[in-house]
């Protein structure tokens, strides 16, 4: 299979997001040792190659998935590959369940997360406080925290059509988070959350002053490079973990909170988390409840 054929498949798959296309390209490159022959090779050979070169079950699934999609596009058989995909998916789920069991005893409580958050405020670690506070109260992903801090002036908060930025808007008595760029945006659209927290407002003002910047005049990013520029996703994830309790990931934070609320059987709170995060209640419980 040529790169040109793969490009043909991508062009025909207009529903794919930029992120997904990038991931597909990365998986396709892994078939280089077999000349990327996803169309001409037999299913058995492709399965064998993936099993021997894929590494983790999750990576094998990703490789097999792109191979299946490409072969379907060119009307080639995929029955054996689909069977292998089901087997790998089952193995991967068992691995995830085992990890959940380990995390049940290792992860801290929500009270500990809040105590850490409060300590950041006391110690005037404004950037850290804002990050962990937003992540906890709104169940945010890393990407959601890639945002600009702006004032509540109409001209700045209106935004342009197709705006792909996230904003933390500082208002007189509260603040508002506006998300135009997050994982499930195409499904749930723009999200707006008002945050009634005087501590958060103070932390935002102090962070701006600490950086010697002017709100509304300078570009102010919550997470940025030393020079104040936009960070890539990997750097954002590392930066966030430098602020969190015990270096936990945003996924760990969500697992702690979801699991505790699920144990209390508080459906309304779970629905709020589901809405804030931009995911279904079913996925929320399956992926983040440690007892499921």
Model regions and ranges:
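Non-catalytic DNA-binding core/recognition domains of DNA-processing enzymes
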Residues: 3-86, 251-255, 278
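Alpha-helix N-cap/helix-start motif at helix boundaries, enriched for small hydrophobics
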Residues: 21, 131, 144-148, 273
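Flexible interdomain linker/hinge and immediately adjacent N-terminus
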Residues: 79-118
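Basic, Lys/Arg- and aromatic-enriched nucleic-acid-binding interface segment
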Residues: 108-143
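Amphipathic alpha-helical scaffolding segments
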Residues: 146-155, 260-261, 276-278
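Conserved tyrosine-mediated DNA breakage-rejoining catalytic core shared by Y-recombinases
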Residues: 147-193
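Active-site/catalytic core of tyrosine-dependent DNA strand-transfer enzymes
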Residues: 186-253, 257, 262
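Short, polar N-cap/turn motifs at the start of nucleic acid-interacting alpha helices
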Residues: 246-247, 265-289
């Amino acid at each position: 299979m040529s790169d040109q054929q793969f490009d043909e498949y991508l062009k025909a798959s207009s529903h794919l997001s930029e992120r997904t296309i990038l991931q597909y390209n990365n998986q396709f490159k892994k078939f280089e040792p077999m000349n990327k022959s996803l169309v001409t090779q037999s299913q058995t050979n492709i399965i064998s190659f993936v099993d021997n070169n894929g590494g983790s079950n999750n990576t094998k699934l990703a490789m097999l998935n792109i191979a299946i999609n490409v072969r379907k596009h060119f009307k080639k058989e995929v029955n054996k590959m689909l069977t292998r995909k089901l087997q790998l998916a089952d193995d991967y789920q068992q691995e995830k369940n085992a990890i959940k069991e380990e995390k049940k005893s290792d992860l801290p409580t929500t009270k500990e997360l809040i105590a850490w958050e409060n300590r950041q405020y006391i110690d005037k670690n404004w950037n850290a406080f804002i990050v962990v506070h937003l992540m906890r109260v709104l169940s945010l992903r890393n990407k959601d925290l890639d945002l600009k801090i702006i004032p509540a002036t109409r001209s700045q908060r209106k935004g342009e059509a197709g705006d792909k930025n996230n904003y933390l808007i500082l208002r007189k008595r509260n603040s508002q988070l506006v998300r135009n760029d997050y994982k499930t945006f195409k499904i749930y659209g723009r999200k707006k959350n008002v945050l009634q927290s005087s501590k958060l407002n103070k932390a935002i003002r102090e962070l701006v002053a600490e950086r010697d910047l002017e709100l509304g005049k300078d570009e102010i990013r919550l997470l940025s490079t030393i020079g104040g520029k936009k960070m890539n996703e990997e750097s954002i994830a590392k930066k966030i973990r430098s602020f969190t309790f015990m270096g936990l990931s945003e996924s760990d934070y969500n697992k702690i909170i979801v699991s505790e609320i699920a144990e209390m059987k508080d459906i309304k709170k779970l629905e709020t988390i589901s809405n804030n995060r931009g995911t279904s209640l079913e996925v929320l419980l399956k992926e983040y409840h440690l007892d499921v």
